[in-house]
């Protein structure tokens, strides 16, 4: 106990020495200094015991604390020296900031955005861009379509554009023209000239404008060609000039230096020309835009585009009227419904819709109504019947092997004689006169007489050497006839009515779709009155139609047959020529060779001539020989 009391002052001294070595701003603990004497033994002993225990712990703990504190101080000092947030180091320590770089986009802002706006903005001065009245002729160098809001011009040709404002803009205002692509997939590309025009000598020599610029200003030395350093877009700027006295427009002459179809340039991509009214600081006071096309023929392209636009408008209006029908929901057919067969037509999209067509004129309306009814009836006809009809039409439309003469058609040859010879109408039946006599040994020549023998046309020779097989075959009649009406060689309606002396009535028939005499064969006089034909022509036309019906048969008239001795000259009937042009022969020239025996010799008596029907006394008295007369054409 005494030893402990004796060592107490030494322990207190050691603790005070250690305590004094600590920093005064320690935040861990604070011990009061010893101010008591040795008279408080119990308290000193308690304190010495406390110090004794703290002596062993404080030696190691405080040493570690000092080491940790010094390390933290060094780290904090290093961090503070490199931190830009400390105000005392902010001015001295250089920082790697993008704002301090001279090439930063934030340091020098672009006067134009990356994607320029093409929305019309009249602004406070009611900025407008107009064009003069232009022509759509092919020779025009430029033209403007108000319908499409599109400018068409030739390359390097002057295109005047008028600028109008309601109030004068501030001094220093300029007008900028900039081309941009119209479509969204091309709008980020810069519009430039193609390499061919940019590097060529044409339109580049002696020009102050850069070769790559598409738009140039003509006749203004104050124009400036701007290449944006950020977006790369090219534009031309001219100072705004107020309109002259007596005018309300300021005209600027622009040139477009590359075609829209140039490869490597615009390459057929549509462009917009943006005209802006700007101040010196780039503030936009007004904006107008229009589409531009640089081509070789502005008038032609404008007309084609406007026609296409009108067609699209008509289709859009038609679809808008029938919008309810076109928006029907698709319904799948139930499994029980059979699939469409091969003979059933598949309707295209829109076949069930109803469309409207405006027609001017009653006659045009009636024609279109007939077409409509025909098409509707066509849908009711079975497809096999339609195919059969088309095959028949193709057979009827095959060209004939014989070329018709210049003044009348010829009958095509027959391949078969339908119904036999007894069923074919003879020449006498065709002409409508009875034969003078009939004989099995002589052909039925009917009313063939001297008058008919003198008519013009090809002769039909009778060859005695022809066999029966040749006589049974159908021969082609080479008669070139010019028959008078109503037996007209041309089946057209015009020739028929002209032959009747009624050319003024042609329009009454053609307006109703009647183009051939075959369409008139079933008309009555009441039908002619319904067609509004004048009364003075009705009876004439009706009689002509009756003569046609009685004169020849359209379905059987085919061609003339001839034989050497007993063949009947007739026209064969065939259904294959129902719609071909049929010529009806009215006048014939027949040459028949008569062999007269030489009975006028010394041994010939007068009674030998009785069977020939000659006046024998006159022949003997005058001694006139019987001669056969031939024309020069027949001799050669």
Swiss-Prot record:
It is found in: Nucleus; Cytoplasm. Residues 1-46 are annotated as: Transactivation. GO terms for molecular function: DNA-binding transcription activator activity, RNA polymerase II-specific; DNA-binding transcription factor activity; DNA-binding transcription factor activity, RNA polymerase II-specific; DNA-binding transcription factor binding; identical protein binding; MDM2/MDM4 family protein binding; metal ion binding; p53 binding. Residues 78-104, 314-345 are annotated as: Disordered. Changing residue 27 to A: Impaired phosphorylation. Residues 345-380 are annotated as: Interaction with HIPK2. One of its GO terms (cellular component) is plasma membrane. Keywords: Activator, Apoptosis, Cell cycle, Ciliopathy, Cytoplasm, Disease variant, DNA-binding, Host-virus interaction, Isopeptide bond, Lissencephaly, Metal-binding, Nucleus, Phosphoprotein, Primary ciliary dyskinesia, Transcription, Transcription regulation, Tumor suppressor, Ubl conjugation, Zinc. SMART domains: SAM (SM00454). Binds 1 zinc ion per subunit. The modification Phosphothreonine is found at residue 27. Residues 94-104 have a biased composition (Polar residues). Induction: Not induced by DNA damage. Isoforms lacking the transactivation domain block gene induction. GO terms for biological process: cerebrospinal fluid secretion; digestive tract morphogenesis; DNA damage response; hippocampus development; inflammatory response; intrinsic apoptotic signaling pathway in response to DNA damage; intrinsic apoptotic signaling pathway in response to DNA damage by p53 class mediator; kidney development. Maps to a chromosome region frequently mutated in diverse cell lines of human cancer. Appears not to be frequently mutated in human cancers, in contrast to p53/TP53. Hemizygosity is observed in neuroblastoma and oligodendroglioma. Activated and stabilized by interaction with RANBP9. Belongs to the p53 family. Possesses an acidic transactivation domain, a central DNA binding domain and a C-terminal oligomerization domain that binds to the ABL1 tyrosine kinase SH3 domain. The PPxY motif mediates interaction with WWOX. Found in a complex with p53/TP53 and CABLES1. The C-terminal oligomerization domain binds to the ABL1 tyrosine kinase SH3 domain. Interacts with HECW2. Isoform Beta interacts homotypically and with p53/TP53, whereas isoform Alpha does not. Isoform Gamma interacts homotypically and with all p73 isoforms. Isoform Delta interacts with isoform Gamma, isoform Alpha, and homotypically. Isoforms Alpha and Beta interact with HIPK2. Isoform Alpha interacts with RANBP9. Isoform Beta interacts with WWOX. Interacts (via SAM domain) with FBXO45 (via B30.2/SPRY domain). (Microbial infection) Interacts with Epstein-Barr virus protein EBNA6; this interaction inhibits TP73-mediated apoptotic pathway. This is Tumor protein p73. It comes from Homo sapiens (Human). The gene is TP73.
């Amino acid at each position: 106990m005494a030893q402990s009391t004796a060592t107490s002052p030494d322990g207190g001294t050691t603790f005070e020495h250690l305590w004094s070595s600590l920093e005064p701003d320690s935040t861990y603990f604070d011990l009061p200094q010893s101010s008591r004497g040795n008279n408080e033994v119990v308290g000193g002993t308690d304190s010495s015991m406390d110090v004794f225990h703290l002596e062993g712990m404080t030696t190691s703990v405080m040493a570690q604390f000092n080491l940790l504190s010094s390390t933290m101080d060094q780290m904090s000092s290093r961090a503070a020296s490199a931190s830009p947030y400390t105000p005392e180091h902010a001015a001295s320590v250089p920082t790697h900031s993008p704002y301090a770089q001279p090439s930063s986009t934030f340091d020098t802002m672009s006067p134009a955005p990356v994607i320029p706006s093409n929305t019309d903005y009249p602004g406070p001065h009611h900025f407008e861009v107009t064009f003069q009245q232009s022509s759509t002729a092919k020779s025009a160098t430029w033209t403007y379509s108000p319908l499409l809001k599109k400018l068409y011009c030739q390359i390097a040709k002057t295109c005047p554009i008028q600028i109008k404002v309601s109030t004068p803009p501030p001094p220093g205002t300029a007008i900028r023209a900039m081309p941009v692509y119209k479509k969204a997939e091309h709008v980020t590309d810069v519009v430039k000239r193609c390499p061919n025009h940019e590097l060529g000598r044409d339109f580049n020599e002696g020009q102050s404008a850069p070769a790559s610029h598409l738009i140039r200003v003509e006749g203004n030395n104050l124009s400036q060609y701007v290449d944006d350093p950020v977006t790369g877009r090219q534009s031309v700027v001219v100072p705004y000039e107020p309109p002259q006295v007596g005018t309300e427009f300021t005209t600027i002459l622009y040139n477009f230096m590359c075609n829209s179809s140039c490869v490597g340039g615009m390459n057929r991509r549509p462009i917009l020309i943006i005209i802006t009214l700007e101040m010196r600081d780039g503030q936009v006071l007004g904006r107008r835009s229009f589409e531009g096309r640089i081509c070789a023929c502005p008038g032609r392209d404008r007309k084609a585009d406007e026609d296409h636009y009108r067609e699209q408008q008509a289709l859009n209006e038609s679809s808008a009227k029938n919008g309810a029908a076109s928006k029907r929901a698709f319904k799948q057919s139930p499994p029980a419904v059979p699939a469409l067969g091969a003979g059933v037509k598949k309707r295209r999209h829109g076949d069930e819709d109803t469309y409207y067509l405006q027609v001017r004129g009653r006659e045009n309306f009636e024609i279109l109504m007939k077409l409509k009814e025909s098409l509707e009836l066509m849908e009711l006809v079975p497809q096999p019947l339609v195919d059969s009809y088309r095959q028949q039409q193709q057979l009827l439309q095959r060209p004939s092997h014989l070329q018709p003469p210049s003044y009348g058609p010829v009958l095509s040859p027959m391949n078969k004689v339908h119904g036999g010879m007894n069923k074919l109408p003879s020449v006498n039946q065709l002409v409508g006169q009875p034969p003078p006599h009939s004989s099995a040994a002589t052909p039925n020549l009917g009313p063939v007489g001297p008058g008919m023998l003198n008519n013009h046309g090809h002769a039909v020779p009778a060859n005695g050497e022809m066999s029966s097989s040749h006589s049974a075959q159908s021969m082609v009649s080479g008669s070139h006839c010019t028959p008078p009406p109503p037996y007209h060689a041309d089946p057209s309606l015009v020739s028929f009515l002209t032959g009747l002396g009624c050319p003024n009535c042609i329009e009454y028939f053609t307006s109703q779709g009647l183009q051939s005499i075959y369409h008139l064969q079933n008309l009555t006089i009441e039908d002619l009155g319904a067609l509004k034909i004048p009364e003075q022509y009705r009876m004439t036309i009706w009689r002509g139609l009756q003569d046609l019906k009685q004169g020849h048969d359209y379905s059987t008239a085919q061609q003339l047959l001839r034989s050497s001795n007993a063949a009947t000259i007739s026209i064969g009937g065939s259904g294959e020529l129902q719609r071909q042009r049929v010529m009806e022969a009215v006048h014939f020239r027949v040459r028949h060779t008569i062999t007269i025996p030489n009975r006028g010799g010394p041994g010939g008596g007068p009674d030998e001539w009785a069977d020939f029907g000659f006046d024998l006394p006159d022949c003997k008295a005058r001694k006139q020989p019987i001669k056969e007369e031939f024309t020069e054409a027949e001799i050669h």
